[in-house]
């Protein structure tokens, strides 16, 4: 029986692994569908698509149910076979032992030992099989996690100290080309941004504006060319030193499920409480924070869900004001807020940007018309460059 059980376990685990991969993929698809439905429920309701979206979600639940049932059905025959072999083993061994005892070939002590061995052996075998099945399912999950962890990290081997401001531009892109996989999104882009100046990036969506900001922040590395800060290639600078020089206000703000105070203080963890309050005042968010149930000690929901979009944006600006980095990137900072909040945010941005080097990504004219230089980016290339008056006088996208 032991030999048969061994081969049953080997064969069943192969089937378990194959079905586990399928079930894991469907579980991920269901999670995405649920998140998509919940986050987009307002849009779906506005466009009268709740029925269609609900049907898609129901379909995902049905597929998950089907895959789970198929997984359990794939295990049932092996479990039945295992129990059958264990049962037959007991049925054969016990009568044989009694027969041998009756013939005087087994002592009573040995007979009791055999009976106890039979009952104690097959129980752990069944338990071991169940645990092996669970481990196989976990192995399928770990394979997917390991695939993510196996992705190459950005190398952080820079050892050069970042110099203080000198004759070199604060920021320079030199013949930069970048691609997401096979899709090239920037091609031979070059520009400079001097200290305490404002450079605006405009152009059609998908043209590569946000990619420029992400490359400067070193979320990715360029495929060709160089990104320099004060004359140093950012790949040669320790990543922590580079991050100390840059603050970024994102279009889509994320706040952590923590107190308002801690969400602002992460801009500079050694800041005093009064410095955090002052940053909040400059970001025009002190008053509404004090109206929250516990003021700065109020725990906000995941992602800042308990606050409006404008309130979240002002808290993120307070975080940047507290950090006081010399280079500020504004990525469509007022693109998705209402008019009332926009005026507060513009005041907060004015406080943030004083004495700073600015890289601004925007669609609205009033945001960038006073920029020292405006670059128009289309399909990954700079197609126009100049200040507002110069570009208005030219024929082109601007």
Label each PLM-derived region with a short phrase.
Residues 153-166, 391:
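Pre-NBD coupling/linker segments of ABC/ABC-like ATPases
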Residues 15-22, 26, 32, 36, ...:
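An intracellular "coupling" helix at the cytosolic face of ABC transporter transmembrane type-1 domains
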Residues 4-15, 42, 93, 120, ...:
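Hydrophobic alpha-helical membrane-associated segments
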Residues 165-398:
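ABC-type nucleotide-binding domain
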Residues 115, 122, 243:
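Conserved catalytic core of two-component sensor histidine kinases
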Residues 1-13, 69-115:
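A hydrophobic transmembrane-helix motif
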Residues 49, 73, 121-148:
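Cytosolic ends of transmembrane helices, especially the final helix of ABC transmembrane type-1 domains
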């Amino acid at each position: 029986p032991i030999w048969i059980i061994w081969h049953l376990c080997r064969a069943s685990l192969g089937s378990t692994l194959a079905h586990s991969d399928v079930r894991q993929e469907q579980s991920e698809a269901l999670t995405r569908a649920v998140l998509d439905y919940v986050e987009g429920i307002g849009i779906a309701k506005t466009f009268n698509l709740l029925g269609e979206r609900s049907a898609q979600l129901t379909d995902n639940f049905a597929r998950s149910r089907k895959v789970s049932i198929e997984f359990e059905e794939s295990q049932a025959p092996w479990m039945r076979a295992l129990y059958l072999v264990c049962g037959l083993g007991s049925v054969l061994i016990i009568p044989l032992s009694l027969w041998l005892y009756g013939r005087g070939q087994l002592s009573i002590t040995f007979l009791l030992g055999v009976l106890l061995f039979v009952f104690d052996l097959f129980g752990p075998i069944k338990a071991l099989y169940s645990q092996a099945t669970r481990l196989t399912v976990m192995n399928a999950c770990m394979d997917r996690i390991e695939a993510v962890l196996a992705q190459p990290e950005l190398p952080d081997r820079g050892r050069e100290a970042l110099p203080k401001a000198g004759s070199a531009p604060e920021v320079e892109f030199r013949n930069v080309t970048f691609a997401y996989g096979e899709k090239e999104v920037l091609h031979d882009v070059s520009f400079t941004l001097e200290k305490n100046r404002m450079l605006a990036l405009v152009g059609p969506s998908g043209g590569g504006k946000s990619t420029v900001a992400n490359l400067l922040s070193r979320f990715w590395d360029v495929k060709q060319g160089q990104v320099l800060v004060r004359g140093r290639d950012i790949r040669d600078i320790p990543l922590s030193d580079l991050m100390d020089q840059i603050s970024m206000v994102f279009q889509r703000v994320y706040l952590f499920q923590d107190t308002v105070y801690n969400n602002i203080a992460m801009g500079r963890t050694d800041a005093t409480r009064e410095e955090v309050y002052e940053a909040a005042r400059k970001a025009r968010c002190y008053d509404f924070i004090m109206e929250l149930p516990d003021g700065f000690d109020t725990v906000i929901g995941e992602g800042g869900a308990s606050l409006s979009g404008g309130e979240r944006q002002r808290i993120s600006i307070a975080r940047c004001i507290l950090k006081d980095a010399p280079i500020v990137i504004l990525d469509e900072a007022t693109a998705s807020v209402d008019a009332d909040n926009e005026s507060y945010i513009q005041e907060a941005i004015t406080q943030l940007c004083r004495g700073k080097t600015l890289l601004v990504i925007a669609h609205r004219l009033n945001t960038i018309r006073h920029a020292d230089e405006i670059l128009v980016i289309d399909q990954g290339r700079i197609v126009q460059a100049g200040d507002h008056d110069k570009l208005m006088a030219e024929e082109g996208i601007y």
